[in-house]
UniProtKB/Swiss-Prot annotation:
Family listed: Belongs to the serpin family. Poxviruses subfamily.
Matching CDD domains: serpin_poxvirus
Protein name (Swiss-Prot/TrEMBL): Uncharacterized serpin-like protein FPV044
A Pfam family the protein falls into: Serpin
SMART domains to which the protein is assigned, alphabetical: SERPIN
PANTHER family: GH10112P-RELATED (PTHR11461:SF211), SERINE PROTEASE INHIBITOR, SERPIN (PTHR11461)
Organism: Fowlpox virus (strain NVSL) (FPV)
Length: 358
């Protein structure tokens, strides 16, 4: 049977590996990744793939061996759905209408209730992308090269905080050593877990969402050099380590001031899969016998992730009241990493970077 520990290992691997590869491609951009979303995509591709394509997915992403045991697969889906229970997500598997689709795969998709199977031409795909607010460039790329198959996965998360954030004027944020911007800030205060982790040269603060269902871990360094060190050394082992677990943090009254941000990123993660060595599903001679008797390949694999930072609509009236609450003040004014975890299982739901909050 699938278990939470096994799934957590895979989610931590996806978090750090995709973060690393996307950062290499766009080092100066904000990033947000939803590992459960990527795991659901890979499970869908595993179900569709055969032979070498399947083995590439299993070997390089260390995914769960799928689905000779339907109960095992169902349990995995159940856990992933629970992790995403407070998010909004839409998954579409588009296949060109000239390709036949096995009834058995249609039944699998219907039973899993995770993705929608859409058959049509490029106009149908573009309409779906438009409904999901994809950018013009990605829509044009689909028109220039009509796809045999595309996957669209959109996920959004926004929630209230256990300790409300309030507006906190505007302050300098040092995007780089040579670029400074003045951006709106928000502030909160409460009994939060916090620590300094020498292994990654980073401060860590745990800020719970309402009802403590999820928490956001903030990883931030005091210098650019140490932030680069953090990016290089934040591994699956670190994300899963009990050293940074909430039970091992110091709890005291602190105030935390951070840039007010809402982050949305859109990636065609096909290039990330290819860099990981997963190439067969994108090859023109790819055979997805579980889906169709006809040959077709995945042309594009779009993932759009969004995390909204809600400040509970409270306006800060007097800055001094926050200064009186605590002598421990954290003012984050350089790039930082955030990780949103599902507290019941300790699973990573989102991992991202704020490079430029503007």
């Amino acid at each position: 049977m699938s278990n939470v520990s096994s799934i957590n290992n895979k989610l931590a691997f996806i978090s750090t590996k995709f973060y690393e590869l996307i950062t290499k491609r766009i080092p100066d951009k904000n990033i947000v990744i939803s590992p459960p979303s990527i795991m659901l995509i890979v499970k869908m591709l595993l179900k569709a793939s055969t032979d070498r394509s399947r083995n590439q997915l299993l070997d390089l992403l260390y995914m769960l061996p799928l689905d000779d045991d339907e109960d095992d697969d169902s349990n995995t889906d159940k856990i992933l759905k629970e992790l995403l229970s407070r998010t909004e997500y839409t998954s579409i598997f588009f296949i060109d209408h000239n390709k036949r689709i096995h009834d058995s795969y249609k039944k699998y998709v219907s039973k899993s209730n995770i993705t929608s199977l859409v058959s049509g031409d490029v106009t149908v795909l573009c309409n779906k992308m438009s409904e999901l607010n994809y950018n013009t460039e990605d829509m044009l790329s689909s028109i220039r090269k009509p796809p045999e198959a595309s996957i669209l996965f959109n996920i959004k998360y926004s929630d209230l905080w256990e300790s409300p954030f309030s507006d906190n004027d505007s302050h300098k944020f040092f995007v780089t050593k040579y670029l400074t911007k003045v951006v709106p800030y928000i502030i909160t205060s409460g009994m939060f877990g916090h620590m300094y982790c020498h292994e990654i040269k980073s401060n860590i603060i745990n800020i719970p969402y309402l009802h403590n269902t999820y928490s956001m871990l903030l990883f931030f360094a005091d210098t650019y050099k140490n932030f680069k060190y953090l990016e290089k050394h934040i591994t699956p082992r670190i994300l899963l380590s009990s050293k940074i677990g909430v039970s091992n943090m110091k709890y005291s009254e602190i105030s935390v001031s951070i840039p007010k941000f809402s982050i949305q990123t859109q990636h065609n993660i096909k290039s990330v899969f290819v860099e990981l060595g997963i190439t067969d599903i994108f090859d023109e001679n790819c055979s997805m016998k579980s889906v169709s008797p006809d040959k077709f390949s995945i042309t594009s694999l779009f993932v759009k992730s969004q995390v909204d930072f809600i400040n509970n609509k409270i306006v800060l009236g007097d800055q001094k009241k926050w200064e009186k609450i605590s002598n421990n003040n954290y003012h984050i004014n350089r790039p930082f990493i955030f990780v949103i975890k599902y507290n019941k299982t300790g699973s990573v739901v989102f991992m991202g970077k704020i490079k430029d909050p503007e």
